[in-house]
C-alpha cells in the first residue's frame, strides 16, 4: 500500500527537548517519537516523556519506540506517557505487539547483516505481523537500534505490501527528495538527519527536511 495521494507523512524520532517538539508541530510534522529502548543515546524516562508530551501540537501523534523491552516496561510507558502509537524494533512477535491495545508499527532491519532480499518479502512480513498498522524499514541490523545515520539499498524494499510503510535510515534533507521519488513511502522517519548531536535537534535541518519532503510531494503531483 502506497501513501495517500501526494502526502508523505513525517515523523521526527528521538525527541529529548520540548522546544524541538514545539517546532516540529509548527512545521506540520505528523508524529514525534520518544525512545525507550535500552542502550539508545536518545533514551528518555517515562516521566520525562510525559512532561515533553505537553509540548505536542494538536493532531500530532506521539510514538513510543521499544527494542526488546519487557511487557512491564511497555505498560508503564503506555500508562504514563499515553502514546497514540507504538513502534517495535526488536524480536517482538505480533501477539506481544498487539497486547497493549494500541496500534503499532513493526520495524524491519535492512542492514548488511540484517534481513536479506529473500526474507524481507511482503507475504512473510504480513503473515508474521497481521495486526500491524504498518512497517518501518530501517538500515540497522537485527538487535541494533536506529539512528545510525546510514542508508540501505532502497531497491531491496519488498513489493506488494498491503500495509503502509515508512522509510528510515540515514535520511536527511539532502536525500529525502530522492528517497520519496524512488520508493513512494507512506511516511519518512528521521532522527540523526535533523540533529546536532544525539537527541539534540537542529531547527534549520528540521525546516529544510520538511521543505524537501513537500517538494517531493509537489513533484509527484506534476
Swiss-Prot record:
GO terms for molecular function: phosphoribosylanthranilate isomerase activity. SUPFAM superfamilies: Ribulose-phoshate binding barrel (SSF51366). It is an enzyme of class 5 (isomerase). Its EC number is 5.3.1.24. Signal peptide: none annotated. It comes from the Bacteria. The keyword Transmembrane helix does not apply. GO terms for biological process: L-tryptophan biosynthetic process. It catalyses: N-(5-phospho-beta-D-ribosyl)anthranilate = 1-(2-carboxyphenylamino)-1-deoxy-D-ribulose 5-phosphate. InterPro entries: Aldolase_TIM, PRAI_dom, RibuloseP-bd_barrel, TrpF_fam. Pathway: Amino-acid biosynthesis; L-tryptophan biosynthesis; L-tryptophan from chorismate: step 3/5. NCBIfam families: PRK01222.1-2, PRK01222.1-4. This is N-(5'-phosphoribosyl)anthranilate isomerase. It comes from Xanthomonas campestris pv. campestris (strain ATCC 33913 / DSM 3586 / NCPPB 528 / LMG 568 / P 25). The gene is trpF.
Amino acid at each position: 500500500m502506497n501513501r495517500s495521494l501526494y502526502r508523505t507523512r513525517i515523523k521526527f524520532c528521538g525527541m529529548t527537548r520540548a522546544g524541538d517538539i514545539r517546532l516540529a508541530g509548527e512545521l506540520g510534522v505528523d508524529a514525534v517519537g520518544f525512545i525507550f529502548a535500552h542502550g539508545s543515546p536518545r533514551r528518555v524516562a517515562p516521566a520525562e516523556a510525559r512532561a515533553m508530551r505537553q509540548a505536542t501540537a494538536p493532531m500530532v501523534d506521539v510514538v513510543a519506540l521499544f527494542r526488546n523491552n519487557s511487557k512491564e516496561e511497555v505498560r508503564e510507558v503506555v500508562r504514563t506517557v499515553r502514546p497514540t502509537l507504538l513502534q517495535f524494533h526488536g524480536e517482538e512477535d505480533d501477539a506481544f505487539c498487539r497486547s497493549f491495545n494500541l496500534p503499532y508499527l513493526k520495524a524491519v532491519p535492512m542492514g548488511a547483516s540484517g534481513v536479506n532480499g529473500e526474507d524481507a518479502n511482503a507475504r512473510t512480513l504480513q503473515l508474521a505481523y497481521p495486526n500491524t498498522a504498518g512497517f518501518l524499514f530501517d538500515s540497522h541490523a537485527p538487535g541494533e537500534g536506529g539512528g545510525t545515520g546510514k542508508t540501505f539499498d532502497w531497491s531491496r524494499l519488498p513489493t506488494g505490501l498491503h500495509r503502509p510503510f515508512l522509510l528510515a535510515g540515514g535520511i536527511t534533507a539532502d536525500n529525502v527528495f530522492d528517497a520519496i521519488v524512488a520508493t513512494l513511502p507512506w511516511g519518512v522517519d528521521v532522527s540523526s538527519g535533523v540533529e546536532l548531536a544525539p537527541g539534540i535537534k537542529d531547527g534549520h535541518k528540521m525546516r529544510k527536511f520538511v521543505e524537501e519532503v513537500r517538494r517531493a510531494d509537489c513533484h509527484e503531483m506534476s
